Structures are given as C-alpha cells and as structure tokens.
From Swiss-Prot:
Pfam families reported in the protein's UniProt record: NIR_SIR (PF01077), NIR_SIR_ferr (PF03460)
Binding residues annotated for [4Fe-4S] cluster, in chain numbering: 434, 440, 479, 483
GO molecular-function term, one example from the UniProt record: NADP binding
Subunit record text: Alpha(8)-beta(8). The alpha component is a flavoprotein, the beta component is a hemoprotein.
Name of the encoding gene: cysI
HAMAP family linked: CysI (MF_01540)
Sequence similarity: Belongs to the nitrite and sulfite reductase 4Fe-4S domain family.
Catalytic reactions of this protein: hydrogen sulfide + 3 NADP(+) + 3 H2O = sulfite + 3 NADPH + 4 H(+)
Enzyme class at the top of the EC tree: oxidoreductase
Native organism: Escherichia coli O127:H6 (strain E2348/69 / EPEC)
UniProt keyword terms in alphabetical order: 4Fe-4S, Amino-acid biosynthesis, Cysteine biosynthesis, Heme, Iron, Iron-sulfur, Metal-binding, NADP, Oxidoreductase
Organism domain of life: Bacteria
GO CC aspect terms: sulfite reductase complex (NADPH)
Protein name as catalogued: Sulfite reductase [NADPH] hemoprotein beta-component
C-alpha cells in the first residue's frame, strides 16, 4: 500500500447513533431482559434490535413470505440467527450432539450452517427459544458472546491437521487471543444464564465503554495455507516455525472486503505487513492494535469505521508506531513466508502423529438431511462414536480429526452411507457462497440457493474447454458487505439486485489480490457467456500452472488492483 498523506488521528464530528446506543446500553444490557418477556411481538424493539448482536444474534425474518404476511396485516416472521464463538473451529463431539439436538427441535429450518468464519450458526430461532439456546451452549462449554457487532469476532486458525504440534500451538494462541479480547461486561451472564448482578461497576479496559467503532476480525495463519483468507481480516498473526515448532508471528493489519455499491469512499483492502514479533509479545500486540483502532477509528461514519480506513487515513507507519508504543516493543523485519493455496484437501490425510483426518465437503456449509443424503444424521452418528474432535474450516467444510487407524473404516462407512463422501468436481470444492436469501436482511441477490446450479453450469463450461481437472476460486456474495469473500476470489459475483450481479475478475488462487469489477449488473446468462469465452481462452493460452485469475491479468483482460484505496474503482 502506498503511504497516504496522514490525516487526523481522530475524526471529529457528530457521532453515529450506534455510538449513542452503546453508551446508553449500560454495558450491553439495554432492556433486553424486559423485551424477552414481551409476547406481543416476535422480535426485539428499539436499541435491543442492535444490542442483541453483541450477544451473538441477528434479528431476521423470512423474506420469502414477508410480502404475504404484510398483506395479512401480520408482522414479519421474526426469528434470530445465533452464531457461536468457536476459536479455530474446534468443537467436541459432545458439543456437536447438543447443537444437533437443538437445531432439530428448536429452529424453524432444522439445519446447522457452517460458516466461512469457522463456526456454526442456527437460523430461525423463535424468541421463546433465545434464552434456552444460550443456556444449552453454556451447558456444553460454549457461548455466543462477541460473535457480532463492534467487537473482536470469532478468531480463525488455519485448519492444519497434518502438522499436529504446530496446529495445536497455533490453535492455543487463537484461543488466548479470543479470550484476551472478550468484553468484560457481565451482561451476557446476567441476561442469558441468570447469574446474579454483582455490586461492582462494569469496566472494559480493552474495548472501552462504547466498544469498537466497527466489527473487528482476527486470524492465526499457518503458511503455506491461506485457508482463512487473511486479507479479509483486521489483524492477522502469520505463524513462523522453526523445526516444526512455533517461535513467533508476522503481523499483518488492515484487511477487509466490505464495500458499498457506487460509494467510492469504500473499498476492499489487503492487509499491511507490520513486522515480526516473538510469541511472548502476542497478547500485548493484539491489545495494542485493538486499542489503537478503538481510539482512532472513525465513530462519525460507520461506512468508514473499519481498521482499513483508519490505516489509510493516518498512514500505515503512524499506526504501526502507535502499536509499538502501546505494546512496548519494536517489530523485527518480516520473516519469510509464502502461500501456495487456500482450499481444503477433501478426503483422508494422515497426520505426523499417525492419526487420520477426514475432511468432508459440505456444500455451502448447510448441514441438513436431504433426500438420499442424510448429512445431519450421518454426522450425528459419527459424533456418537468418534473419540477425537470435529473442526470447522474457513471453507465451510468439516474435518473429522484424530481418527485412529482402527476406527477409520467404521467412520468412512457412515460417511459414505450418509452422502458425506459423494464425489464432487474440483470446481465445486473451490466455490463458496454466503447465506443471503431468505434470511439475510441485507441480501440483494441469491447466493447459497443460487450457487449449486450455477456451478453445474460452470462445470459444463470447464468440461467443454477440457479443464475439468482444474478449478477457479469462485465465490458468490448476496450483497457488497461481502460475507462470501467474493472480493478475494478469482471470479467473484457480488449481488446487485434479484437475479443480477457485478462480475469481478483478477484475484488469484492464494487470496492476495483484490479482483476488479469486469461487468456490472448482469444476469446469470450474461455471466456464463462471459465466462465461456474467458475459460476457453484460459484453456488455450495459459502458461504452465497459471491460474485463471493470473491469466486474466497477464492477458490484459482486466487491470490488476494494485492499491485498492486508490485504484479499485478506476
């Protein structure tokens, strides 16, 4: 990134209403407890509509039936999405059995949704079941605290089951960072777990009384895999190992993908390298980055409030120097690292500890019993007999981890009988979508429900041009907020309106380049026509090992985005 002429450290002006809401919330309590007892509405009112996000929930409604209910003079069918806090995506089989039961008995849709932030979501929780879901999670050692809104969200960690010691060390740091940056308010325990109010005054030494200016995302990355897409995140710790043992981290700050259609003050941005730090400084540095963003982030405009905008406003070197000052360290030069891929290796792999790990492809992360493919039941049966754990990946897949040789055949039999090991193409394995319709209130176009048939068409194009054994990193996101991480794909579709998308090209396979808009507001048939031509050219003209995104740049089909704060919209 180029060093912009430094602007003010703090943006003066009228604060957003979200800042008022946080300040008046009494450390995130609001009147949520009273609202829970209001049976006249299925939703939360006023500030509570937003405050519940700090408790891991979003209020949604079924948009497929919204108009019909309005005609009947009924309020929307309100239901909550709940997102679990699950650092590194590791979940025990006992915990899995509990969430399977809750999803089946207490949600409208009956499904478990794995997300690309290495956790699971329940969709369709009615208000009467909101308190029970938090209590169920607590009973098995889980919670939903700080998985949404202006806090440090679920901390990601590379799903690396092969190098077991390195993964274990990195995973422990992901958990430590998550715990260190959690809010200290007792509001969650008081409201959901019926814990008594104590006489002490709440304090938030790291997050502050009004918490962060905007959402904040953190990762721990183990090269050469970039499965967690570090450039989508505010703060990234890239593991540096010597002889298979973790010795420290490279720190990268200021990634983020959310944009707003037509608003050139918004942009996706890759993270900036700050330097290397030994392990013992990890928590101090994490706290310093968060508190610098807390104090310098823009609280007058939520569309310009994320860390990426703070870095561009004050300058990377200024922000870095402040982190060094607060953490009491000087960063060492970045240690060498490289990424070679970010997809999951589907199927069995043997770890260096001689245990086996089975990565299951879960299309769109949606776990449900389908006709002839009882995925949810199959995973429950595996959870009942498996002695290791499950690991949710940042590609919305699931790893059955730590399987001894003696148990391998038994688990494989259940997986195959349940449709969990059905063969899929490389293209389908490397495609992803966010949830979008019918539950997401921000959705502009279909994503999860659109992707399977769209990939059928892409598979046909790949076969037509003789590249069925290849893949293109392809992602669909239903709106420009970018949950599907389309703005780090080789081919990214960003929802614009029902049935219409902006087509972005020119990202790369390893997720280190932002794609540029190639065509705007086009239909599926127009997208397929464009890709038919371009895949054909790639098949004929590519260099050895050249990915589709790199080809589109080299062939002059699309100009690479070099400095997105300045040239993304050119």
């Amino acid at each position: 990134m180029s060093e912009k002429h430094p602007g003010p450290l703090v943006v003066e002006g009228k604060l957003t209403d979200a800042e008022r809401m946080k300040l008046e919330s009494n450390y995130l309590r609001g009147t949520i407890a009273e609202d829970l007892n209001d049976g006249l509405t299925g939703g939360f009112k006023g500030d509570n509509f937003l405050l519940i996000r700090f408790h891991g929930m979003y209020q949604q409604d079924d948009r497929d039936i919204r108009a019909e209910r309005a005609e009947q003079k009924l309020e929307p069918r309100h239901a909550m999405l709940l997102r679990c806090r699950l650092p590194g995506g590791v979940i025990t089989t006992k915990q899995w059995q509990a969430i399977d039961k809750f999803a089946g008995e207490n949600t409208i849709y009956g499904s478990i949704r794995l997300t690309n932030r290495q956790t699971f979501q329940f969709h369709g929780i009615l208000k009467k079941n909101v308190k029970p879901v938090h209590q169920m999670l607590h009973s098995v050692g889980l919670d939903a605290l700080a998985t949404a809104n202006d806090m440090n969200r679920n901390v990601l960690c590379t799903s690396n089951p092969y190098e077991s010691q390195l993964h274990a060390e990195a995973y422990e740091w992901a958990k430590k960072i998550s715990e260190h940056l959690l809010p200290r308010t007792r509001a969650y325990a008081e409201i959901w777990l019926d814990q008594e109010k104590v006489a002490t005054t709440d304090e938030e030494p790291i997050l502050g009384q009004t918490y962060l200016p905007r959402k904040f995302k953190t990762t721990v990355v183990i090269p050469p895999q970039n499965d967690i897409d570090l450039h989508a995140n505010d703060m990234n710790f890239v593991a540096i190992a010597e002889n298979g043992k973790l010795v420290g981290f490279n720190l990268l700050v200021g990634g983020g993908l959310s944009i707003e259609h037509g608003n050139k003050k918004t942009y996706a941005r890759t993270a900036s390298e700050f330097g290397y730090l030994p392990l013992e400084h990890t928590l101090a540095v994490a706290e310093a980055v968060v508190t610098t963003q807390r104090d310098w982030g823009n609280r007058t405009d939520r569309k310009n409030a994320k860390t990426k905008y703070t870095l561009e406003r004050v300058g990377v070197e200024t922000f870095k120097a402040e982190v060094e000052r607060r953490a009491g360290i000087k960063f060492e030069p970045i240690r060498p690292y490289e990424f070679t891929g970010r997809g999951d290796r589907i199927g069995w792999v043997k770890g260096i500890d001689d245990n086996w790990h089975l990565t299951l492809f879960i299309e769109n992360g949606r776990i449900l019993d389908y006709p002839g493919r009882p995925l949810k039941t199959g995973l429950l049966e595996i959870a009942k007999i498996h002695k290791g754990d499950f690991r949710i990946t940042a590609n919305q897949n699931l790893i059955i981890a730590g399987v001894p040789e003696s148990e391998k055949a038994k688990i494989e039999k259940i997986a195959k009988e349940s449709g969990l090991m059905n063969a899929v193409t490389p293209q389908r394995e490397n495609s992803m979508a966010c949830v979008s319709f019918p539950t997401c209130p921000l959705a502009m176009a279909e994503a999860e429900r659109f992707l399977p048939s769209f990939i059928d068409n892409i598979d046909n194009l790949m076969a037509k041009h003789g590249v069925s054994d290849e893949h293109i990193v392809m992602r669909v996101t239903g709106c420009p907020n970018g949950c599907g991480r389309a703005m780090l794909a080789e081919v990214g579709l960003v929802g614009k309106a029902p049935g219409r998308y902006n087509l972005h090209l020119g990202g790369n396979r390893i997720g280190t380049r932002i794609p540029r808009m190639y065509k705007e507001n086009i239909t599926e048939s127009e997208i397929l026509a464009s890709l038919d031509e371009l895949i054909g050219r790639w098949a004929k003209e590519r260099e050895v090992g050249e990915g589709f995104g790199d080809f589109t740049v080299r062939a002059g089909i699309i100009r690479p985005v070099l400095d997105p704060a300045r040239d993304l919209w050119d």
